Amino acid sequence: MKVRASVKKMCDKCRVIRRRGRVMVICSANPKHKQRQG
């Protein structure tokens, strides 16, 4: 899980979602692409 000021999709399998007011990126293809904003 990377914590970043700005989260972006790293591949076409990445999905941007909101959980508990936080913007997150989850990826089924590559778990290294997981990110959280803040």
From Swiss-Prot:
One GO CC term, this protein: ribonucleoprotein complex
Annotated keywords = Ribonucleoprotein, Ribosomal protein
Family annotation (InterPro entries)? Ribosomal_bL36, Ribosomal_bL36_sp
- Gene Ontology terms for molecular function: structural constituent of ribosome
Instruction: Report whether Transmembrane shows up as a keyword of the record.
Output: no
Q: List the disulfide bonds.
A: none
The processes (GO biological process) annotated in the record are: translation
What is stated as this protein's family in its record?
Belongs to the bacterial ribosomal protein bL36 family.
Q: Output the HAMAP family linked to this UniProt entry.
A: Ribosomal_bL36
Protein name per Swiss-Prot or TrEMBL: Large ribosomal subunit protein bL36
Protein's organism: Synechocystis sp. (strain ATCC 27184 / PCC 6803 / Kazusa)
